[in-house]
């Protein structure tokens, strides 16, 4: 059968990647152009075998080949073709397959883009190849997507999880995976640098754009996941500190610190030790995320598997990677040449301080994720760590980091602050930020220190970079577009989150059909409720006519769906979007008196939160494709 061909190609790819790893690491490739060329060709062959194996798998899903157990368990003939494709990464085995294909893709692009004369390339390719072998063995031995149902396959499949039948799922997981595994490039180059032991090799310049590329994918992936959960799961917010959200946040925080540290290392040969350590940390946290999601040790809407064997394999494999990396780092530590003199209040000093603050955030998230697991293991009781814990740490640390970022704009490389540092941009930005903060405090009658501090810090960054843009427009002074857009996005993100927390409201209403309720400035009229029939589900759809204080009226139609195959019931939100707020309605159960529970949320500036995050990603794209822009 065709599935056997796909299976065989993946096994063949595993063998080729092993050969690349062995010859790259254990033979002197730097003295053999032929061997370097052979390694390049062999890796490419392994990638194409694996890629074609995946393409065959996609074709089998599209054509409803229920001989394949995974497809039978997660697809259905009634599914549109689009969802038959996305069903491949809707569960553990298929998503792991996609993860590995993307990992090999990063290696392939690095393989063909980097010249064979690059001294770090052979060993980097070897490290990537051995990591691929480890994950492929995990896939084939514990999570085999090629298992068949013999002798008689089912006539129809079990269907995909209804909450995953959404267009965003075509983009969110693949983008997130590309971000996770993309950090294999800086990790592999850092380890190759340690293996060579030559401190003069400029590995940082080699990995700069690769690192930013992975960071862009991770940023966009996290943002899309937040948006998807908002409208699909009925949570009505942008972030809920779910454990799997958190394990995506940790590598993003580490990667952000790594990219800044990388810029310092390239510019001044400082923080080189930090940079290597952060490259190891970023990839290790990406692997830790894979372990958390796929080991079954947590309950989450995002988790895939519940198999101790898989968890033990992943834990052992990740432990081997981390232990080997740290051992090499400690072994070569004394030979790494890095200028240790960082002048007070120089740009490097502010970046170093913020790296420490980012480390604090990473540690707090790691503690929040792992402490409940450890507690349950020791005492056989479940506990959870929620938003109050994270907010208590994140708000002051992020505000402090933003203030250091503000001062770093006017600081110089390798120079301490002098009197000229305290110039008009600093005083003007600070004055405008204080004025805005005072206005918010008075106009909205709030005494919340966390909200006011966040608005102050965010606006501080925005006003300072607006000054930079004005300088560019009228004085033609060069500005770094990556830095300006990325950091202004951070400021906008802080301000948007603050106003969202300050202004957003929620209320559960009990409404009869043909009756009206008022909430805030809204009049909500429950017009009707009806039944809709579709190819793979039917639904109860409510119709509401909503009118705001300006007389603008619009219809909202939330649903409760029942999917035929699984019999699962889901809630579909109805959202009216404006520039400043979302009107968000979900329908609950019918009460004994015939009325319906209707949950109404007014979410201010929530779209600006996602816009800010996507703008950060856009800034990264500018850096990746620009020849002039420097990190």
Task: Indicate residue ranges for each PLM-predicted region.
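Membrane-interface interhelical loops and short amphipathic "cap" helices
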Residues: 1-9, 32-36, 59-93, 144-173, ...
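Extended, hydrophobic alpha-helical segments in both membrane/secreted and soluble proteins
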Residues: 174, 181-191, 203-260, 274, ...
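Contiguous transmembrane helix-bundle modules in multi-pass membrane proteins
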Residues: 1-33, 45, 50-52, 66, ...
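Membrane-interfacial helix termini and the short, flexible loops that connect transmembrane helices
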Residues: 22-39, 69, 103-125, 191-207, ...
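Interfacial and helix-entry/exit segments of alpha-helical transmembrane bundles
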Residues: 42-48, 127-128, 202-224, 266-286, ...
